[in-house]
Amino acid sequence: MTTKKLILDLDMGVDDAMALAYAIASPEVELVGITTCFGNVRVEQSAHNCLAVLDLLGRPEVPVYLGADRPLQATEPYTPPASTALIHGKNGIGGASVPASPYEPVGATSVDGNAAVDYLIDAARTYGPDLVYVATGPLSNLALALERDAAAMMSIGRVVVMGGALTVPGNVSAGAEANMASDPEAADAVLRSGRKLTMVGLDVTHRVVLTRRDIAGWTGSGTMAGCAFASMVEHYIGSYEMNAPYLGGCALHDPLAVAVAIDPTLVGALGCNLRVDLLGEYRGRTICDERRLSDPDKSALVALTVDAPRFLSEFKTRMARVLG
């Protein structure tokens, strides 16, 4: 079996950290780089969180690239709303105390350009069909890369995005999911580009839930990584207990996206062509594009069912492996 190259595009909140850990624990892929975006935190915080968690998990050599610091149409850098800090903590990783990495993200000393987009295009040209790209935040970096070099981006073997909601309500408005709503223009550009991708949205991520009982062993491991991740996720579960107690734990949004990138058989998907509403009360909603309903070539696979027991078993096994 050929090991695929993996790039994660993260807005480094708590579930992003779990997705990163899942990727590191997965022998099917080689994590070659991380690109960062605004979202759960400002992009600079996202990058430094990535570096700190990589160091914590024994992978400090993985490069981290600074990406988009704002939505495509914004004139000022993005600042997360106060509600986001309640979910992910002020530092984005549940307030957990994780030692800072001695390294800096690529692009930290540059005032021009977007290091993440530069890297993504170079990686697409280098690895082509052997590259897997997973975006777990706003799609700003992907949209910019498609605009700059569509041919390179079309050559990537697999693209998976965590975001959207097709058959269930949104989580920031009646119709919109947070990642898509953070930069609707970017999401719409990606979904209309023709680039084939799999959308892992709220339709399935709210069906894979982690409980306090599930993470009890992380603290019991006695490792720094286990204790840090337990602290992060305890905060995250607490936010769900306040805002969505009916779930019984926290949704594993981003880890599921990484898992599906590795093993697409975890989900059942509907092929369709998507767009994003850009105006009015439904701004940020992902929906089938009425103008392309009869187009036989479907650019998106939307995950609508998930083998939750199998995924949760894999998640617990891999997290135990990486957290000690």
What are the functions of these language-model segments?
Residues 36-39, 67-69, 279:
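Acidic/polar N-terminal loop/beta-strand segments that form early-domain functional surfaces
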Residues 18-20, 46, 75-77, 172, ...:
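Short, glycine/acidic-enriched capping/hinge loops at junctions between secondary-structure elements
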Residues 2-3, 22-23, 30, 181-185, ...:
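Conformational coupling and interaction surfaces
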Residues 64, 190, 258:
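A residue-level signal for conserved active-site and pocket-lining positions in enzyme catalytic cores
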Residues 16, 88-90, 141, 253:
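Histidine-centered active-site/metal-ligand motif
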Residues 2-52, 60, 95-206, 212:
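Active-site histidine-anchored catalytic micro-motif
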Residues 47-126, 298-307, 311-314, 320:
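Metal-dependent C-N hydrolase catalytic cores
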Residues 78-86, 173-177, 215:
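Short, surface-exposed amphipathic charged segments that create phosphate/polyanion-binding patches used
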